[in-house]
């Protein structure tokens, strides 16, 4: 894309990031985990460990989505190393990066900080100062691996969301039996369950649109219009410092409400390569999957989860692949 051509709409990127190895964060988190069960403590630990992936997330955005205006990094009093590195970048790239503290977006609700809950943090993203109406939300394990255009994310300003329709769990006999025999499983805040829960809040009674773990195109106005402005309702959502099954996914809730209002474009073809448990399948399989998708032009997004669990030798190979893929001259 010619950098001199002004896009029809401004699009920002938002990345939520935590340095799980930070001693102050570990201490702070430990104070709130004292009453938590050991199983949940382990779950929280792996969710927030990181191996420097955010460098490749940011560089992939700059390289493969040059239309992006600002790149907001939302974090808890931390700053990734790439911010220091960016001091040597050309101004046009350096000025894209903006670190936003949780206190800024939580505004009058800072009493619920610190929070270690991405579901809670996501609910407040629309409160980022100067955030564009159109933005794409990234987790720090989501990467772009091929060139993209605004039209891959928005059509005439309307978000384009890929996924597939699924029956609500309560409508499937297997889950009905499971919840009857093992009622405690209802209290697990799983990826699919939370999306189904979000759809039900939006009024869906039979099915929900299951989306993938990929960068998410969103409208700021959808958050303001579709997430309750009632203070009590918002507090009920953001009061949990760790994930809770009672919470909805804010992006899924606004998407389902947008579906009701015909202000969302759905597509069922997948443009994502998603790799789960790389520590289980081994680096050879991971690299094979990555290389295999090089020739698939429809796949432009990548998600690799739990890289912190990969052994150091395999991790270096995977990170080297990401480094090569996202290499760009920024100086």
Predicted regions span which residues?
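Long, low-complexity C-terminal extensions of enzymes
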Residues: 10, 245, 249-331
